[in-house]
Amino acid sequence: MTTSSPPQAVTTLTESIKNLLESNFCHIVVKGELSNVSLQPSGHLYFGIKDNRSFLNGAFFHFKSKYFDRRPKDGDSVVIHGKLTVYAPRGQYQIIAHALVYAGEGDLLQKFEETKKRLAAEGYFAIEKKQALPTIPKSIGVITSPTGAVIQDILRVLSRRCYQYKLLIYPVTVQGATAAKEISRAIEEMNKENLADVLILARGGGSIEDLWAFNEEIIVKAIAASSIPIISAVGHETDYTLCDFAADVRAPTPSAAAEIVCQSSEQQIQVLKSYLRYLNAHAQQLLSGKTKQIQQWKRYLDHVDFFRPAHQSLDYLCLSIERSIKIKLSQYKQRYMQYARWLQSDVLQRMTYRLYDLWKMIVQAFHNRLIAAKHLCIHQKKNLTFLNTQQFIQKLDLWKQQTRRALRQRLGYCSQSLTHQQTSLKHFITKLNQQFTKENHALSLLQKRLTRTFANRVDEHRESYMRSRENLIFSLHHLVKRNREKYSQVSKQLTLLNPKNVFKRGYAMLFDFNENFAIISAKSLHKHSCVRVRLQDGEATLTVTDIQNFETQES
């Protein structure tokens, strides 16, 4: 018995068929009727698709996360987009789906593609017409249904991530015959009144019929004409409408749209947080310096000699003021006593005596001159026989009267001068006493004011120091308390993220024996290969004896 080629193992042949199918049937579209539909708790959908003559197994992984609004059932006519593959353990080929369209939706999809091409040719989807979102929007407009989970999701995200914003909700119908007109009118009115910095056009997921209002030309043209940037958040991540292409930004979900609006705010917050970290470090440094200063001041306060220099300076100042006042008082008192002694002395008496002596001298001199004249007259009388004695006596009496008159006038002048000098001296003493009293009063007021001023300044400095000390101590306690709270929160988060807590609940991690990387899929294992398993309290080496694919088994 001869053979043209060597025999092949079943696995080798199956792998060859699998590679051939996957390379030639990487994208296929199959139309048929569903049967044996099974939606697993994991979200994967296993099904069969058939027509009158044939049957084909299929799987749609993560189906529930993409099409949770409608659950397929046996008998549904569908169009499935996917690729062919081979399940090697059973030698069966199957289709792995990535899109599922119910019968009747094909016409809408064709209309969708035709409208999309026409509007794109007219420039409604041009990238250069896209507007940038504002950095920090102060007013956010939302065009959606006022009832439902969409608006609640948006509000929850905005309240968590945005700061100081104004939200305007324009209620519209998001499904039905009038939905397109209401939505386009809402966009036009928001632009006309310039009510918002950015608009979010939002709706939850649904079938292509439910979302068809957002494929109408009237909405696309309203979005293109809007001067306010618009974020389209219609349906789920796998749902696309013409509004998504016309809008300035497309968000996979309404919650993601709210996050996009707040993204720039988050960046600003990160910048502010970096500034806050710098301020905290600077405050810590400043607080450390102030704490040392407070401790030093506290040591001073605890010591008796802290206020001694201030008290000593104040005492020296008071003594200086008192000494100056005493010196001034002593000077004025000496001057006053000097004038008083001068007034109380026998100066006036001596001046009177001197005037009296002067008068006596004048009288005596006049008397002497009279005697001399008398003797001269007698002598002349004897010598001159023809002298008229009576005439001479008259002349003598006249001269005597003139002399007395001149002497009396001279004495009057001296008396008036003495009286004037006495009056001037009394006036000067009175003025001196008034000035002394005034200066004494001013010095007394100055002493009181200086004493009161220095006492007030000492009290003010003491109160200012106590207030500064209390403020610093309060700030220190507040900062320590806040840092303790932050430390407690971070410690709790680290405890929750600790992988050892996962091990305590009975879980383990597999690592490749040689390469030391984590094993997350059964496809990377081989029979009789060794792996390391990490548990809570140690590690162990295991040998792979059997490999099973849970997803393929369920199909």
From Swiss-Prot:
Pfam families, per database record: Exonuc_VII_L, tRNA_anti_2
Catalysed conversion reaction: Exonucleolytic cleavage in either 5'- to 3'- or 3'- to 5'-direction to yield nucleoside 5'-phosphates
Function: Bidirectionally degrades single-stranded DNA into large acid-insoluble oligonucleotides, which are then degraded further into small acid-soluble oligonucleotides.
HAMAP family according to UniProt: Exonuc_7_L
Keyword set includes Hydrolase: yes
Oligomer status and interactors: Heterooligomer composed of large and small subunits.
Protein keywords: Cytoplasm, Exonuclease, Hydrolase, Nuclease
Protein name: Exodeoxyribonuclease 7 large subunit
